[in-house]
Structure formats: C-alpha cells, structure tokens
Design a protein with these regions (language model features):
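ATP-dependent carboxylate activation and anion-phosphoryl transfer catalytic cores
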Residues: 24, 34, 41-208
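A conserved helix-loop-beta module that forms one wall/lid of the active-site cleft
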Residues: 1-30, 35-37
Length: 208
C-alpha cells in the first residue's frame, strides 16, 4: 500500500493479492521496525485481529498506530544495499544479506550475498540507486529489498530505506575497506562523496 491503511483497505488489498496468487499479506508498522507491529496474514478471517494487534503494538512502541500492507513473499531472502550520496551523486557499496533472522531480528549479515545471481544483483542495485538519485540523497543509508529469485514475475520488492548508518555497517566496511562513520562525518561537513571508487569484495558464491 502507498500509506497507512484502514481494515477495509487492508481487506481489499488482501483480496487483490489473493486473486494474483499471493500467499497472503504482511502488515507492518509505519513508525518503526524490529518486528513490532508486524504480522504475516494468510487467511482473510485472521485479518481483522491482526490489523488491530499491529496498530496497538505500533502505537505502544512508536507512538504512531498507522500500519501498511504488502504482498507476502514466503520464501524471500532479505537483501540490503549500502548507498552513500552527497546530494549530487550516489554510489553502491554492495549488498548485505540478512535472511537468517529470529522473530524478525537479524542474526547474521553476509557481504556480499552468496545466493544472489549476478543479473538480479545488478537489477536490485540499480533500483536502489534510482531511488537515491530521485531523492537527491545526501547521507549514508540502506535500501532494503525482499528477493524471490525463482519468481519470473516479481523477483524482488522494495521494503524501506533507512537514511542512516546501522549497526551492520561494519560488515560493509570489512568488504570495502572504508570507514563509513568517517565518511558520514565528512559528508555532513560538506565534503563530496568519494566512496564510489571503493570495490566491494566479490562473492564466494557462484552468482549464477
């Protein structure tokens, strides 16, 4: 959905996705993450309770009760692209894979992803860069996607962008040799971004 939804709107979205063969929908809080205000719904009868619970959890955790809905991708992998920008240009510092999670909390981060085909890696990276350019992005941030490499019609979807460094930025630092904290400090002081010259480590996977 494009924004916060009412129960009626969530139900309409569920019916639309079901007609397209989706397994269900994911309800997610607008105000924050960490698994709070977030539920997968695969049965239309469960939607009213799930919608109400997510709104209640979101209000308690973030002070904002709004939730949105998206297509449920049951076997998706979680891929995030590290993007620096200086307001004029943007670059990619490669991806991290954080599919291994418990209760929607990331347990392991791998950079680069050993499971991502090269063509799909390129498509996802370009999608992240297009969004960053469109926003005139100036910061270090993470553009996150769900990926279903076996799908011929919907191989990946955008989840969210976090316009800040996250704790997992050190994984990207290890792969590029860059000090991203210093990079962000320099950017805040007005220095142009030069991280695009860094080359992320190549994947140990086949990439096929």
């Amino acid at each position: 959905s494009a924004g916060a939804v009412t129960l009626a709107q969530a139900q309409a979205f569920f019916a639309e996705q079901q007609a397209q063969g989706a397994a269900g929908v994911m309800i997610k809080a607008i105000g924050g993450g960490g698994g709070r205000g977030m539920r997968a719904v695969m049965n239309a009868d469960e939607l009213p309770e799930a919608h109400a619970r997510c709104m209640s959890e979101a209000k308690a955790a973030f002070g904002v009760e709004g939730v949105y809905v998206g297509r449920l991708m049951r076997n998706a992998r979680h891929i995030e692209i590290q993007v620096p920008g200086d307001g004029q240009a943007v670059a990619s510092l490669g991806e991290r894979e954080c599919t291994l999670q418990r209760r929607f909390q990331k347990l392991v981060e791998i950079a680069p992803s050993p499971s991502l085909p090269d063509a799909l890696r390129t498509s996802i990276t370009q999608a992240a860069l297009r969004m960053a350019r469109a926003a005139g992005y100036r910061s270090l941030g993470t553009f996150e996607f769900l990926v279903d490499a076996e799908s011929a019609t919907l191989p990946f979807v955008f989840i969210e962008a976090n316009p800040r460094l996250q704790v997992e930025h050190t994984v990207s630092e290890a792969g590029t040799g860059l000090d991203l904290v210093e990079q962000q400090r320099a950017g805040a002081a007005g220095a142009p971004d030069d991280s695009g010259s860094a080359t992320p480590a190549s994947s140990t996977g086949s990439g096929q």
